[in-house]
Amino acid sequence: MMRIWLTTLLAWGVLNASSITAPLLDVQNSRATIIAENVREGMSGVIVRTFDATHSTIIANAHVEQFNPSNGRAILKLSKYDSLRQNSLPGGNWLVQPSDVAVLASDYGRALLIAPNDETYDTITKSISGIEWIHPDNYATYLSYKGHPTPLKEDFNRYCTANSIGLLYVHSADTLFTLDCKSFTLLQTAPSLKKEQKSSSPFYSRIPTIRAAWWGEGSSRLDSYEPYYLELIALNNSKNKELYELYKAKFSEKSALLRYFEIKE
């Protein structure tokens, strides 16, 4: 059985993160400020308003745009709450204010794993505790409905939002990448100890075929598992210096993947 080097990572960090709650200190336009510990840039969450001892509601989405670990100060980017959509019911028209509370990593107990084969999938899901794993069969069914045999970033975002999934794990190039599924920001990486021998496209699932739309982005079938996910992660984390150095060390300084980064040497 494949062994994954996760021992030290399972005990701390975002892999088993509990919700982080902090009051808003300041709100200016579409941004708010909090003071909190164990925060990572890219973490997503919600803004909650409490009306009384028994009544509260979510009024906005939020994700960490900047974080200063020296003083714990985080700047949140605010956006419309879109996890529950029901056009037939009235919705609130509240503006976020300093008396509200930010709840980050609220969905980090649920995760989706993109793996190349069943052996890798079973090993990782059994190695990481405290996570409710959403089976990739469900995601493959969603992609078939959309007609996208090649999953797009927007497909991950919408599926995770609709199903309250906070973390996306992607195993590629002998590395386990942990991303916030809603912001697609890389949170953590862990190396594996064994090279993959086989891979399914677009990922391991028990769904034999994902329906393809006639045309449009995502309608083409994925030819190769590994390059696609490495590129997708790089494109959406182009300013991540640690990811840039990881790619450079793993694939050489002439790798085509490095062109996706906005990093100055």
What is each PLM-predicted segment?
Residues 17-265:
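Surface-exposed, polar/charged interaction patches used for macromolecular assembly or partner binding
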